[in-house]
Amino acid sequence: MLGEDDESRVVRVGGGIELRFHELARAYPDIVDDPVLDFLVTARSELVSVEVSVRTLDGDGLDVFLAELAEDFRGWEGLRTWRSLEGDLTLSARHSGRSVYLTWGLHDRPPSEEWRFEVTTAHAPGEDMRNLADEISLFLESEPRP
């Protein structure tokens, strides 16, 4: 679900544990055409709250990865994977025939890598995945905060 939160674009994914993509910012705003995009991903439920800062080069193709999953709505064999520039956000996708299961990994940054948190969300193939890809694309293309 796409929404506005504190005057910035937010994407929410999931049910029992909600993933929230928010606070898009340029890492080096003084550099013209800076490709380094940072954003926060927060995983929250009644029992847990985890937040990680994610560094990408113009989104690292997360929206394209999700769009390709949507296009392959009939299914695929095995896992498909994606990771952000510094590995602070990972995503693996599995198609069961009836659902697409996305396992989102939030990771501590190197060199410590002391913790990681994973949550799996289920999505209907096709339109549901296409909507998610579109929401992530709109988020990554939105105006970064200063």
Model segments located where?
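Short glycine-rich, low-complexity/disordered patches
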Residues: R74-L89, S142-P146
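A structural detector for beta-sheet-dominated domains
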Residues: V13-G14, R20-L24, T42-R44, S53-L57, ...
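Short, low-complexity cationic-aromatic patches
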Residues: V32-D34, V48-L62, V119-R130
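Mixed-charge, glycine-accented linear interaction segment located at domain edges/termini
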Residues: R109-P146
